Design a protein with these regions (language model features):
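Conserved binding/catalytic microenvironments
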Residues: 1-267
Length: 267
């Protein structure tokens, strides 16, 4: 994907300049969103921030939903840099704008995506009041989507909302709550893509490790690698979990040794 994006972006941008329609510019914002996502996963932060700036410029000519996704990614740069308060301010401004300018299912989808980003930011900030506000709002938007939908690579619905809730409970150190959510999800046949299933297992591993369940944490980390190996390889969460598990295991563990080799982490 990394090798294909430059050419795809060039062609989409040229096309958007020729036809100059909101849908054409929405394609450009979608590609920049992919650039941002990949750059953030690899921790190429300068590229991630540049992609979001370009995405925002394209979004000025694009569809309202493309604009929502651009704001969501902009707030993501604040999340990546640790400026959770700044990210929440970006989200809140976008929520107000969406409430006034959008309608129908598209409005519910846009607001849902924004509130999930706000939920993550509030959890990292450990602001329980903001967590409750964004969580409640996200679940209200889910009422419009009984099944998860994928729009421009963004998922929204009951499953993806639950994965965000679970991650936030881990951030707030409510580990049992997090694992209860994971257990509920585990009893379903999930429709989410691998890029969402992988983090679900990683967060389960975080919760289990915090509860001193080393074997359970390792099993969940293995599940994350099996669900999304490319993501697990570059994820800072996966890398940190692996290092901690290596430090805790006094005896050789074949499963841990295999994961360390895949991740190129020394034992």
């Amino acid at each position: 994907m990394i090798t294909r994006l430059p050419g795809l972006l060039s062609r989409a941008t040229n096309y958007a300049h020729i036809v100059d329609t909101p849908d054409a510019w929405a394609m450009v914002t979608d590609i920049y969103s992919s650039v941002y996502w990949l750059a953030a996963r690899h921790r190429w932060m300068d590229l991630a921030e540049l992609a979001v700036i370009k995405q925002g410029l394209a979004a000025e000519r694009a569809t309202p939903l493309a604009g929502i996704i651009a704001v969501r990614d902009e707030a993501g740069t604040f999340l990546n840099s640790g400026d959770f308060e700044g990210g929440l301010a970006v989200v809140d401004r976008a929520v107000v704008h969406a409430e006034l300018s959008m309608e129908g299912r598209e409005k519910a989808l846009g607001l849902g995506l924004l509130h999930l980003r706000g939920l993550t930011l509030a959890g990292r900030r450990r602001d329980k009041k903001e967590v409750e506000r964004h969580m409640a709002a996200a679940w209200r938007m889910v009422e419009e989507f009984p099944q998860d939908v994928d729009v421009c690579g963004m998922q929204f619905g009951p499953e993806n909302t639950a994965t965000h809730v679970m991650a936030t409970w881990v951030d707030l150190e409510h580990y049992r709550r997090a694992l209860n959510v994971a257990g509920d999800l585990g009893r379903r046949t999930l429709t989410l893509p691998a890029t969402r299933i992988g983090p679900l297992y990683m967060n389960a591993a975080r919760a289990k490790l915090a509860l001193h369940d080393r074997d359970g944490a390792l099993n969940s980390l293995v599940d994350a690698w099996e669900a999304s190996p490319q993501m697990a390889k570059v994820s800072s969460t996966s890398q940190e979990l692996l290092r901690v598990l290596i430090s805790l295991h006094k005896r050789s563990n074949p499963t841990l040794t295999k994961l360390a080799k895949q991740a190129r982490v020394g034992i």
